[in-house]
Curated annotation (Swiss-Prot):
<dbReference type="InterPro" id="IPR014014">
    <property type="entry name" value="RNA_helicase_DEAD_Q_motif"/>
</dbReference>
<dbReference type="GO" id="GO:0003724">
    <property type="term" value="F:RNA helicase activity"/>
</dbReference>
<feature type="coiled-coil region">
    <location>
        <begin position="40"/>
        <end position="87"/>
    </location>
</feature>
<dbReference type="Pfam" id="PF13959">
    <property type="entry name" value="CTE_SPB4"/>
</dbReference>
<feature type="region of interest" description="Disordered">
    <location>
        <begin position="551"/>
        <end position="590"/>
    </location>
</feature>
<dbReference type="GO" id="GO:0005730">
    <property type="term" value="C:nucleolus"/>
</dbReference>
<feature type="compositionally biased region" description="Acidic residues">
    <location>
        <begin position="27"/>
        <end position="62"/>
    </location>
</feature>
<feature type="compositionally biased region" description="Basic and acidic residues">
    <location>
        <begin position="63"/>
        <end position="76"/>
    </location>
</feature>
<dbReference type="InterPro" id="IPR025313">
    <property type="entry name" value="SPB4-like_CTE"/>
</dbReference>
<feature type="binding site">
    <location>
        <begin position="140"/>
        <end position="147"/>
    </location>
    <ligand>
        <name>ATP</name>
    </ligand>
</feature>
<feature type="domain" description="Helicase C-terminal">
    <location>
        <begin position="335"/>
        <end position="488"/>
    </location>
</feature>
<keyword id="KW-0067">ATP-binding</keyword>
<protein>
    <recommendedName>
        <fullName>DEAD-box ATP-dependent RNA helicase 27</fullName>
        <ecNumber>3.6.4.13</ecNumber>
    </recommendedName>
</protein>
<keyword id="KW-0378">Hydrolase</keyword>
<dbReference type="InterPro" id="IPR011545">
    <property type="entry name" value="DEAD/DEAH_box_helicase_dom"/>
</dbReference>
<feature type="domain" description="Helicase ATP-binding">
    <location>
        <begin position="127"/>
        <end position="302"/>
    </location>
</feature>
<dbReference type="InterPro" id="IPR014001">
    <property type="entry name" value="Helicase_ATP-bd"/>
</dbReference>
């Protein structure tokens, strides 16, 4: 109670100092105060009540100012709510305020400091169910606010259950990639700023012993990748998880794509069945539905069924409104020249460029930096510390160029990305959606996306259109594309390390192209290898070991493992893959 008067008096003094520069409407009353104060100083000793009257007058004026300020703020808030109501919710936001959720004060305070006011569609439709302890399966576009949708109820559950470190882990969040796990942990850290509960993350690439020590001390909210979580469940004796209350699975479709299904089955067997389960996925496929059945398994006496929330089923576009999308048709031989010209012009912007292989990312990063176009790179062959540092540096940067593989295509919230360039086309439409989802995120988010296509790949646009993705053709001015081919060939030919890197990138590009699931479009035998070699700065195709038969066999084994031998089932009528036999809808959505 003691600090309150001190704060009040200090605010009074500061306001008195600011009075001489107050706005005109208040200057009249201010001059009256000053003249009254001067007159009071000249009064006789018999008029001792004047100072008290002056203090009372000041207090009345302060109260009037506060009331006016409060009324002004209330009117502004009402106006904003009215505008929201007239618009029916702008973009992904609704008219529902976070202050209406009724969460605990520590959580509410953290949300205010994170400057969140209105809930998104997925948050408004899922958080109330989750706060009531329901199981939820959610589907929403990337960048729609799914992370807050599952973290806020989870933190509230820990708070009301009075979880302490000695109680062990109460919430587990499973993420498909290390970067997404770290990012989710950082969001949870902000939300739990005023809570007493503990949190941590365990991911591949980090020291296992340090993680085991952390788990033994008690981690109430744990973010993990599947492989490392299963490792600790099997081998870490000090890991207390018998009181687990909630399991959250983020980006379930990506988990399945990365063949984590068997790991997840083993995780389900070890975790308590009497728990709340939350599953979020950007796309809904038959495989995700089957996986959901395993995820929501309960004890026999449990009769509750999960609540299904799909917020974009009626949308006419599979991508967000603020995204401008285009494609350009370029021969293999000129692909890099066009990319170079584009990036040179956009060096003051924030750009992400997607490639099909780690070696291709590595080579192009080395070459572009050699050509004085500064860029960073992220791919799966890097050590975790390098990936993490690069990722957070790019997040903080106002401008920059990041070259990456699909490791950066899902879930990551990178602020203010201006351009997404898909130098190598994605494997299928849903991968396209997730790549472009790195830009135009959140309410009123804006960004641009550019897809490079070879002339024989134009049929891919039919599949994109079937997936509710419309692109505009862009034509590059040939006069603005520099004629550097011979110069680039000399650079790569004379630099041993660049030459070796280029050979590996060339080989990986061909193998990645051969592994495309949509072989009616991406047929490796239709490639002009001399032109492909030119895009990697070779005059003639280099001598590299390319065993396409082995690569094809590996791809067939992968398909048998992923889809029970039925292959992908992708077609123009069903760009998301095979559906169940009784499913008559074009898209398997909830």
């Amino acid at each position: 109670m003691a600090p309150a008067p001190a704060t009040t008096s200090s605010s009074k003094r500061s306001k008195k100092r600011k009075q001489p520069v107050a706005p005109p409407p208040e200057s009249d009353s201010e001059s009256e105060e000053l003249s009254y104060d001067t007159a009071a100083a000249d009064e006789e000793e018999g008029e001792e009540e004047a100072p008290n009257q002056m203090e009372e007058l000041e207090e009345e004026q302060e109260e009037e100012k506060k009331e006016k300020k409060q009324k002004k703020e209330m009117s502004k808030e009402k106006k904003r709510k009215k505008e929201k109501g007239n618009e029916g919710g702008s973009g992904i936001l609704t008219n529902m305020l976070f202050s209406e959720l009724g969460v605990s004060e520590p959580t509410a305070r953290a949300i205010r400091e994170m400057n969140y006011t209105y809930l998104t569609q997925i948050q408004a439709r899922s958080i109330p169910h989750l706060l009531n302890g329901k199981d939820v399966m959610g589907a929403a576009k990337t960048g729609s606010g799914k992370t807050l949708a599952f973290l806020i109820p989870a933190i509230e559950m820990l708070h009301h259950a009075h979880f302490m470190p000695r109680n062990g882990t109460g919430v587990v969040v499973v993420c498909p990639t290390r970067e997404l796990a770290i990012q989710t942990h950082n969001v949870a850290k902000e939300l739990m700023k005023y809570h007493s509960q503990t949190l941590g993350y365990i991911i591949g690439g980090n020291g296992r012993r340090g993680e085991a020590d952390q788990l033994a001390k008690g981690v109430n909210l744990l973010v993990a990748t599947p492989g490392r979580l299963l490792d600790h469940l099997q081998n870490t004796k000090g890991f207390i998880y018998r009181r687990l209350k909630c399991l959250i699975i983020d980006e379930a479709d990506r988990l399945l794509e990365q063949n984590f299904e068997e790991d997840m089955k083993q995780i389900f067997k070890r975790l308590p069945l009497n728990r709340q389960t939350v599953l979020f996925s950007a796309t809904q496929t038959e495989q995700v539905k089957e996986f959901a059945k395993l995820s929501f398994e309960k004890n026999e006496e449990s009769t509750s069924k999960p609540v299904y929330v799909g917020v974009d089923d009626a949308e006419t576009n599979a991508t967000v409104e603020g995204l401008q999308q285009g494609y350009c048709v370029i021969d293999s031989a000129r692909r890099f020249l066009v990319l170079y010209a584009f990036l040179k012009k956009k060096q003051n912007k924030k750009v992400m460029v997607f490639f099909s292989s780690c070696n291709s990312v590595k080579f192009h990063a080395e070459l572009l930096n050699f050509l004085q176009i500064e860029c960073s790179d992220i791919h799966g062959k890097q050590k975790q510390q390098k990936r993490t540092t690069t990722f957070f540096n790019f997040c903080k940067a106002e401008k920059g160029i990041l070259l990456c593989t699909n490791v950066a295509a899902r879930g990551l919230d990178i602020p203010d990305v201006d351009f997404i360039v898909q130098y190598d086309p994605p494997d299928e439409p849903k991968d396209y959606i997730h790549r472009v989802g790195r830009t135009a995120r959140g309410e009123k988010g804006k960004g641009e996306a550019l897809l490079f296509l070879l002339p024989q790949e134009l049929k891919f646009l039919i599949y994109l259109k079937a997936a509710k993705i419309s692109l505009t053709e862009l034509v590059f001015n040939e006069n603005k594309v520099p004629n550097l081919q011979s110069h680039l060939e000399n650079i790569v030919g004379e630099n041993y390390f660049l030459n070796q890197s280029a050979k590996e990138a060339y080989r990986s590009y061909i193998l990645a192209y051969d592994s495309h699931s949509m072989k009616d479009i991406f047929d490796v035998h239709n490639l002009n290898l001399k032109d492909v070699a030119a895009s990697f700065c070779f005059k003639n195709p280099p001598k590299v070991n390319i065993d396409l038969e082995s690569s094809a066999s590996k791809h067939r084994r992968k398909m048998r493992k992923v889809d029970g031998g039925r292959r992908h089932g992708i077609s123009a009528a069903n760009p998301y893959g095979r559906k169940g036999g009784d499913d008559k809808r074009q898209f398997a959505r909830f």
